[in-house]
Amino acid sequence: MTKDEAVKIFNRQRVRTHWDEEAEKQHSLIVEVVSPDSSPFTCLKKEMYITDDYEADLRNLSKQKKAVVLAVEVGGRYVGRVTLRHDWGDETSIIEKDFPGLPQINALEIDENYRRQGLATMLVTVAENEARRQGFSMIGLGVEISNEPAKRLYEKLGYSYQQVGGSDTYDFLFGKPNPQVYKLRLMTKSLQTEANHG
């Protein structure tokens, strides 16, 4: 099975994908939706960086059908994750003002031992297809201005930079009780430019 075929059959249930691309020959991958109320999420939280605050956020959004957590499992352990969210949170409501209804790809993370093997591209593609399936015609994400590898990945995947509130960057506050300020760029991509993968 090719990566594209695996992405096409994704249907919000556990999907086993066994493709044989050069960089992934040794891995049998599982891409799955992980509910924040499930025991697999407990494992995902331990294996990937998920704070208690973010978990609470995801639980709330999931109950409202406004978030889908996708994870990649290799050899029985989680090595990557991403969230498709229908909101931008309180700290970045300026985005919702300029781009109402824009869903976001959020919290993309790949274990450092599994990077540069196509897993990030696969997770972004699956998240885009899920957004398409949900009826969205555009998707966005925030990328830290100093994160050159992520910016290159998103540019390669067809994302383009947008201004928010008349500025090239926006502030994102992360962490409690003493939040740290990150400078981000908004990137968006039309989901109508590619054939529907459903």
Question: Where are the model-predicted features located?
Answer:
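Conserved glycine-rich acetyl-CoA-binding loop
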Residues: 107, 111-125, 134, 145-152, ...
